[in-house]
Amino acid sequence: MLDRLWEVRQALPLYLLVSTLGLAISCCFTLICPHVCRLIPALTTYGKAADQQEDNSLVEKISVPKKWFKHFYAIGLLTLFICLHTVHSLIYNPNYLHPVVLKILATLTRSYSIPPITPSTSILALLLISLHVARRLYETIFVSVYSDSRMNLFHYAVGIVHYIILPISIMCETQGVASKLPQLHVSIDDISLTQWAGAVLFWICNWKQHQLAEQIANTRKGPRGLIRNYAYGICFGGWFNLVSCPHFLFEICIYLSLFLVIPDAYVYRFIIMFVCINQTFAALITHSWYHKTFPKYPKSRKALIPYVL
């Protein structure tokens, strides 16, 4: 029991636990009693939902363009490259990392036991995340149409930290990084059928989310793909007939499918918890915004999960 409590006290689990709890409390205030503390909704929302909040000069001063989302993915790709290179190098040179660096990495996650992630699984997971992050970077640059909406520095910082922590958490729990083994190897035979199924599901969810991103962008584009306006509109067709935010739903599915690939990863469980709560509250806040903004918004639509939530 004490060992388990110590694991939570490690840097990454503790950060994710505190962040998730703070996010949940802030979003509850925003949804249930936004007028109790006007600063909380201003810090919790961004984009179109933030435009609905009363002006807050402090938050406005520390806000950045929403189109800076691309920084999340650019920094995430760089971190992924470093992590992939590190894991690959350790396979052929166990002494690739300096002992001081290994000690620092060990403090980020559980250090009392041998990390359960094999190099084969680690490389597969990091490659899958690279696919996801590269796709999101492409969409933010070439697909999405951003208005003049902004997000505060709190969202910006949390987003950047998230895409740095995601690959690092997997690397830290890989054999050879936080533990020394006499011999490491990579083999396709190390990947189970369940892990391959998770990889396929991960790809399908990414493809579906990409289609949804294009569908959202098309509400602001004309027949020839030229931007015709920056106003917010209502999407119809497919998943949008069931929920207001299917792209958030598939974001959750992407992270859950990756869990099939790395089921023994410890810190990743905290990441899933953070993503699920973040996307759920974001969907509820967005869903509420649609109903307040468009009087004829379809009442049969749910926020995130068809027929349920």
Swiss-Prot record:
PROSITE patterns: S5A_REDUCTASE (PS50244). Its main location: endoplasmic reticulum. One of its GO terms (molecular function) is polyprenal reductase activity. The chain crosses the membrane at residues 12-32, 72-92, 114-134, 151-171, 184-204, 242-262, 270-290. GO terms for biological process: dolichol biosynthetic process; dolichol metabolic process; dolichol-linked oligosaccharide biosynthetic process; polyprenol catabolic process. It comes from the Eukaryota. GO terms for cellular component: endoplasmic reticulum; endoplasmic reticulum membrane. It is a multi-pass membrane protein. Keywords: Endoplasmic reticulum, Membrane, NADP, Oxidoreductase, Transmembrane, Transmembrane helix. It is found in: Endoplasmic reticulum membrane. Its EC number is 1.3.1.94. It is an enzyme of class 1 (oxidoreductase). Plays a key role in early steps of protein N-linked glycosylation by being involved in the conversion of polyprenol into dolichol. Acts as a polyprenal reductase that mediates the reduction of polyprenal into dolichal in a NADP-dependent mechanism. Dolichols are required for the synthesis of dolichol-linked monosaccharides and the oligosaccharide precursor used for N-glycosylation. Belongs to the steroid 5-alpha reductase family. Polyprenal reductase subfamily. This is Polyprenal reductase. It comes from Caenorhabditis elegans. The gene is srdf-3.
